[in-house]
Amino acid sequence: MNPHHSHHHSSYGGGGYPGQAYRQQQPPSNPYQYNQPSPQPYQGSQPPQNGYNGGYPAASQGPMYGGRPGIADVYHNSYNQGNHSAPAPPPSDPVSFGQGAPQGYNFQYSRCTGKRKALLIGINYFNQKGQLRGCINDVKNMSTYLNQNFGYAREDMVVLTDDQQNPMSQPTKANILRAMHWLVKDAQPNDSLFFHYSGHGGQTPDLDGDEDDGYDEVIYPVDFRAAGHIVDDEMHRIMVKPLQPGVRLTAIFDSCHSGSALDLPYIYSTQGILKEPNLAKEAGQGLLGVVSAYARGDMSSMMSTAVGFFKKATKGDEAYERTIQTKTSPADVVMWSGSKDDQTSQDAQIAGQATGAMSWAFISALRKNPQQSYVQLLNSIRDELSAKYTQKPQLSCSHPLVAL
């Protein structure tokens, strides 16, 4: 969204969640000390008693999820527990992209049994033109949800919001880029990484010819007027490109023009695939034998769903080929966005609290049914949104996502 226009969202005055020592670079002076993460999320709008020390956590080893409801992995899922109408676990071996990808180029599903790390960014742009109201609430809600439902420990989350006193916790361009590097640092196969951005988004003319619409997607740090925006190409280079096969990165963008913020080559709508490399042709040839029917790791168990295919009109095959060559990834990257690139994200007043519509719908849909496929979840999010808004959710992926 153009940062000069007001867009969603009542401000929330809470503080950030504490982290452990940030190993790469300590802030110059650190008046805050924090040892153990609080076992329960704080309630209401009061910040926690312990100050956030601005340090980024070193992710702990993944907890054991056996017998815990709502957390499926390749070993503990409804299929293995006797429900054979549920999807089978994902293949653990590398899987081919199929036509349109470089020769011998594979991706690998994450078993999501390893470390869990999350980076959550919420920017209300206090005292700036175009101030927003609900972005910090989005982050507060998402962090609580990840902690209570998906086993993300508070000490393995970095929260950047512009209501925090510590300068290291402000969502400045430098802090956001540093935190993006932290998120993917030392990621190993079967780790689960989560990225959430709620704030202003926008578009800028595409300089390298890789976007269908001629524009790159951008996000606006709190200091964008001085430091500039962050382009999708840079987010892809930092957070997607370095990932090893078998690492899961889930990203949610609740901002205007966020439909392709991570620059991933496969884009899904509730009707089917919007952008894909020759997959429609492969479907006709019966080559879509690889099924990403995945016991859902972070998000939801894949269940049988038919996906319709159609091609998005692009500005030319050259841009298309360039994207496929440079933006596919051997990792397992999934992105949810609150608006397609030609839409704007909506304001929301849910139960008297200002929130981003996408963030709210994502959590609401999963609360109602945690065992959903990606495509079902996309439709559930659409249903949640359609009751109140015109906004259409979108799902992007670094690899073919097909549930048969």
From Swiss-Prot:
The keyword Protease applies. GO terms for molecular function: cysteine-type endopeptidase activity. Keywords: Apoptosis, Hydrolase, Protease, Thiol protease, Zymogen. It is an enzyme of class 3 (hydrolase). GO terms for cellular component: cytoplasm. It comes from the Eukaryota. The active site is at H200, C256. Residues 1-10 have a biased composition (Basic residues). InterPro entries: Caspase-like_dom_sf (IPR029030), Metacaspase (IPR050452), Pept_C14_caspase (IPR011600). The keyword Metal-binding does not apply. Its EC number is 3.4.22.-. Pfam families: Peptidase_C14 (PF00656). Residues 1-100 are annotated as: Disordered. GO terms for biological process: apoptotic process; proteolysis. Residues 24-51 have a biased composition (Low complexity). Involved in cell death (apoptosis). PANTHER family: METACASPASE-1 (PTHR48104:SF30), METACASPASE-4 (PTHR48104). Belongs to the peptidase C14B family. This is Metacaspase-1A.
